[in-house]
A protein has these predicted regions:
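Glycine-rich helix-loop "coupling/hinge" segments at transmembrane-helix boundaries
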Residues: 133-134, 163, 212-253, 257
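Transmembrane alpha-helices
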Residues: 77-93, 183-216, 265
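Transmembrane alpha-helix signature in integral membrane proteins
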Residues: 21, 68-103, 261
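Periplasmic/extracellular loop-to-transmembrane helix junction in inner-membrane transport proteins
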Residues: 4-13, 42-87, 234-252
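Generic hydrophobic transmembrane alpha-helix motif, especially the helices
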Residues: 58, 62, 68, 89, ...
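N-terminal signal-anchor/first transmembrane alpha helix
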Residues: 1-42, 112-115, 194-195
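C-terminal transmembrane helix and the adjacent membrane-cytosol boundary/short C-terminal tail
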Residues: 139, 149-150, 196, 202-204, ...
Length: 283
């Protein structure tokens, strides 16, 4: 509890980071809590196609006359969940194999680095388009795994470099001399000293996963099922909403939702870097 109060105190001294933290909480509430209190309105209403913002429809309506605000509320859960899972999978994968490569060294290090180098040479967007077009993933888990497999190489190299520097520290040498085992050395001695680095990378990986997910949905490379901010953008484009004078709200709403959530994440990550780094904190 004292640690949480200290964190909030440090965060309060960074207005941009505090705004980002509040923004993240707002969108998490919007995506996961608000749907319990706001009924889904997905029935087409042809008489209200592309309505301008009003008291009845604060963000206007779409090409089927459905309320845009209602879609924003229900469209956040899918895109945020996939982004979170993709960041989680890629972070765990990179940390595990990056730490093993640095700790074991030798042939294991060479093999892992070789695979990483090959992965880094492949254009990620092209590979993603090909994989998505072939597999046509529709579930949270499959899409998150695909995104994670494209994100891990760059982090793995960074984790390896961090572990290489930590393995020479006195407390790691002491653990090794006590024969505490590889698992203990990596997960009890090294990784706790990298937690700030891991948290910041996780946040940034989530932003990348959300943007990438939005791109492949907008391009129509995966089945358009459920409610999703990116699906709103796809239909806004495919239904020609951009050509209707009063329909810009239908396009602008999901763009702002994605952009503001991403901005909140980046602002929070920047503040966390200041808080976790004593040199930046004292600057």
């Amino acid at each position: 509890m004292a640690g949480a109060r200290e964190f909030l105190r440090l965060l309060a001294g960074r207005p941009v980071g505090l705004a980002g933290f509040i923004g993240v909480l707002f969108f998490v509430f919007l995506a996961y809590v608000a749907p319990f209190f706001v009924p889904l309105q997905d029935t087409p209403n042809i008489s209200e196609i592309y309505q301008t913002p009003s008291l009845a429809h604060p963000l206007g309506t779409d090409f089927q006359g459905r309320d845009t605000l209602n879609q924003i509320v229900y469209g956040g859960r899918d895109i945020l969940t996939v982004g979170f899972l993709a960041a989680l999978f890629s972070t765990v994968l990179a940390i595990t194999f990056g730490a093993l490569a640095a700790t074991l060294g030798g042939r294991v290090d060479s093999i892992i680095l070789g695979i990483t180098d090959v992965a880094l040479t492949i254009p990620q967007l092209i590979l993603l388009i090909v994989v998505a077009a072939i597999l046509r993933p529709s579930g949270f888990l499959i899409l998150a795994v695909i995104l994670a497999l494209l994100q891990w190489p760059s982090l793995l190299r960074q984790v390896r470099a961090q572990v290489l520097s930590l393995k020479e520290r006195d407390y790691v040498e002491a653990a090794r001399s006590l024969d505490l085992g590889l698992f203990h050395i990596i997960f009890r001695e090294m990784l706790p000293n990298m937690r700030s680095y891991i948290v910041i990378h996780f946040i940034l990986a989530m932003t990348q996963a959300i943007y990438t997910q939005a791109a492949i949905i907008f391009l129509g490379l995966i089945p358009l099922t459920g409610q999703n901010w990116a699906i709103m953008l796809y239909f806004a484009n495919s239904q020609g909403a951009i050509f209707f004078r009063d329909s810009f709200w239908y396009i602008l709403s999901p763009i702002l939702a994605i952009a503001l959530f991403q901005l909140s994440l980046v602002s929070l990550a920047s503040a966390l870097e200041d808080i976790f780094n004593p040199r930046l904190r004292s600057a």
